[in-house]
Amino acid sequence: MSIPFGLDLGNNSSVLAVARNRGIDIIVNEVSNRSTPSLVGFGQKNRFLGESGKNKQTSNIKNTVDNLKRIVGLDYDHPDFEQESKYFSSKLVKLDDGKVGAQVRFAGKQQTFSATQLAAMYINKVKTTAVQETKGNITDVAIAVPAWYTEEQRYSIGDAAKIAGLNPVRIVNDVTAAAVSYGVFKTDLPEGEEKPRVVAFVDIGHSTYTCTIAAFKKGELKVLATAYDKHFGGRDFDRAITEHFADEFKTKYKIDIRENPKAYSRILAAAEKLKKVLSANTAAPFSVESVMNDVDVSSQLSREELEELVSPLLSRVTEPITKALAQANLTPEEVDYVEIVGGTTRIPSLKNAISEAFGKQLSTTLNQDEAIAKGAAFICAIHSPTLRVRPFKFEDIHPYSVSYSWDKQEEDEDHLEVFPAGSSYPSTKLITLQRTGDFSMQAKYTNKEELPEGTSAEIAKWDITGVQVSEGETSVPVKLKLRCDPSGLHIIEDAYTVEDIKVQELVPLPADAPEDAEPEYREVTKTVKKDTLTIIAHTFALEEKALNALIEKENELSAQDKLVAETEDRKNALEEYIYTLRGKLDEEYSDFASDDEKTRLKEMLAKAEDWLYDEGYDSIKAKYIAKYEELASLGNIIRGRYLAKEEEKRQALRSKQEASKMAELAEKLAAQRKAESEKKESKADAEGDVELD
């Protein structure tokens, strides 16, 4: 049975949660952090994923790729690419399919990876973290992504999960996942005919800002509106601080960090810390040692100065809120509560602006960093066939209208708007077309002008085959089950022909009919399913052959990472054994080895040490094991003698302690018997006494 796994795929860091023990738990990583850096680094032999990649980011800056969720499914020629590219220190390139990829130096040569591959590497890493922490089987996952993700980006994330060995049961909007977390754990929601509670969720993370308004009743929620600014987040504040100090240090210290990626990265990391400090303090010092050219830099920044630096950003705070309210047809007064989510909402100026926009105090019922992951884990649990969870129904909404079109044959129309903007999903619509033979269908966004700049209106295409028209007929009715699935993906779930047949139907007898009345029948026409048709889908999903090739590649890279880690462990074990054994040989092991054994073992240790720091510095796992076992063949004999003597001492001490206890017990028993004897004698003397006059 798979443990339900929820992943809040963040731009700067990601949070993992699982459903277990009748609750939702956050997974800590290998260094006990409750979030894991969202990046992938490449080295001479292996990859550095998550925490290890973050630790090496500054020294390995050109071969470390972060901001992964921003380039998944993104065209190199998309208008967003120019804006995104400034956040990357690694080299981004245009792939053969027109998508964005990253070029890095890995295993001694230049290699290029697609954004989907990079996301898969990271997802595989966090899956491994979850498996190690839970010690269970994890195959199903619900992944939280931005509400503005297109159909193509959702397919790309789903493919990345599959490459990582997971089954993506749902790609869910991140703020919707937070709303689910709110609805599941709130115990005071209205019921029955009571008015729903309207809650606005404002999520400002590392790179994006979303406002979602939802209506709640006990056991259910309905998303009323979602609006966003996909280029507004904590990284913009970090960059504003960094650019400010870049100008200052150019004048003050005559250095230009913009010309040195490592220096810029160090100032950027320090700027992120300063931003957090200024959320709790009105001013703070800023210093970084040896930034570049052996120059130490220092300065300070006040909260007021920061707000002035980011004033263009602050002027955009209310726009998503205004749009969401208009979309939901609500006034700020009609919103009952405003919940804030995401680390960037801790910035005081943002909190004040959000509060003023709604005209009410902000609520912090949810854990700002973990609510999305917990909601995603619960959603994954809903899909589990073996896990029972409390009933909870939720619906998201289509941000844009979607129409289906088909080859024009018998009908006057050749298209239909099936899922209007603002309608709920998941949902299914059944349509009937008169067809003369096999045909094609397409799904497109109805109004291209409503889409974000650069977004393609194309969604998917399907070929429907197997249509057979009966002799004497010119066409046949075809029913199509059109569906927007729980992940917001548009599919044709079923397609089949129908025909009308004549059947005899029993006529109900009148209430006063005699018991022996003969049954009456009438002939009626019924429409029944005739032939199931073949649906060949052409979507943004990877084709099976390409997907399998990427799965195989990821498995190879994972095996190599594992081998490198195990090799390093064996090398460290050998080094530790050399130092430990050498020290003990002159101390606690001294009396348990002959002079000849000491001399021989010290020579072996010296040779092993010389080898380890020379030709063995970069050797293979098997050689480290062989060297270790060679030393252990004699070292363990000496150690065995020492342990045997120690055990002998312990046994002697234990025997002595037991003898002491037995003697003490015997002494107590003797004293007890003596006391009882004296008591009896005293009683006998008392009974024998006779009083004489």
UniProtKB/Swiss-Prot annotation:
Record's keyword annotation contains Transport: no
Q: What is the lineage of its organism?
A: Eukaryota, Fungi, Dikarya, Ascomycota, Saccharomycotina
Q: What is this protein called?
A: Heat shock protein homolog SSE1
- Native organism is Lachancea kluyveri (strain ATCC 58438 / CBS 3082 / BCRC 21498 / NBRC 1685 / JCM 7257 / NCYC 543 / NRRL Y-12651)
Q: Where is the signal peptide?
A: none
Where in the cell? Answer: Cytoplasm
Q: Which residues form a coiled coil?
A: none
> Which protein family is named in the record?
Belongs to the heat shock protein 70 family.
Q: Which residues cross the membrane?
A: none
